[in-house]
Amino acid sequence: MVEKGASDLHITTGSPPRLRIHGRLIPMTEYPPLTPADTKALCYSILTDRQKHKFEENSELDLSFGIKGVSRFRANIFMQRGAVAGAFRSIPFNIRTFEELGLPDIVKELAKKPRGLVLVTGPTGSGKTTTLTTIIDFINREREEHIITVEDPIEYLHPHKRCLVNQREVNADTASFKDALKYVLRQDPDIVLIGEMRDLETIQAALTVSETGHLTFATLHTNTAAQTINRIIDVFPPHQQEQIRVQLSFVLEGILSQQLLPNADNTGRVLALEILIPTPAIRNLIREDKIHQIYSAMQTGQERFGMQTMNQSLYDLYTKGLITYDIALGKSPLPDEFIKMVEKDLINTKRR
């Protein structure tokens, strides 16, 4: 898996193992289709007795583990058609830099904030954890503070550098995100990383931790900045939503909504990134429940504030030859707008 540069390995009955390479799922044809006995033996080979017992109770198990000199891995073991199956993701030991990920300088500025809420969003497999890991590593090298992470499971390991780093894993070091966040303020943190804002209690805790003067990072499975804001507010009952809009408008420092796309020659993947920086005008729009107007503010805030919409990011990658037109159009949240951007550029090119 690691030698072939695969991001994921899938093990299930009736198929040879399959590797995800640059987004495509490729069967390892040198192996025969796996039997139920094969998949159970392979998946159980990495489990402790305690983990085996928990899996047999729940039929689901999240975990992470490392192989010395090879890589760390995140795994999900599950049942399908009465047989054991597993999905494994490779987590490199080396943490990548902002430049290696293609993150703009404005993201580094978010890592320098003394307090507030920074959200990294996107679909599964879009690199949210990798982006957050790079941000946390930058803070770890640049600041002298206390970082607490709550993850399910722990993926990247952060050694103590200039910061003190405590990493807590759900179901190993704490019962749940909710329980960990209930006590986090008593642990004297400066920076808090929440692996995923899954429910009302976790979202409320993230807002409270941010509001009390801590820099807080979290992820959500949303595709755009505006959708992220709506998701946070809509989780709460109607009578609380006005209060949450006000609270969010004060604590929010940035939203990074990302996608990983195959590059133009299909030899790797590149990052497309929507960036929202809450200017005073955008904070007012959040408070006044005018979320639909935020997109226009982002379009005009690119040069001055470092913001960009997903279409602006896709267009930039396309004009640089990093992705194809078809990929850009297929991944655009507003394809008609993207087509007009390309047509406008063609007209301007002809006039020159």
Name each model feature, range by range.
Residues 1-352:
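Short, flexible helix-loop junctions that flank or precede catalytic/ligand sites
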